[in-house]
Amino acid sequence: MANIYQGEGSCWAQNEKIYVPGSGIDARSARGILSLIERELKRGWTYDHSCRKIRMTPALAKRRAIYLIALAKKHRGAAEARRVAELVYSWLEKHRLLSGAVKRKIAAYVTA
């Protein structure tokens, strides 16, 4: 199972020759991944973990963006997760993907 966005072995690196460097999620890598998700949302497709092309929907983009917060908390701790949550919140707001439920979910990640 390949990483979709991060690392030299990621799906993006293999197929697009672009990837987010490093391992683990911090604010810098989250910003890079959000920009790749944005590109996928515009073109209408993405990769799954087997590097096959699949449809990119707003719902999938939202799930992937929110998951960055959980990964940041796991890899770097609560303080970095809060910074990533702010980025994700702004990104979701910019793309009109922010709802009350999503706000609560982001708040739960940051406070838990």
Task: Identify the residue ranges that each predicted region occupies.
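Arg/Lys-rich, low-complexity, intrinsically disordered basic segments
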Residues: M1-A112
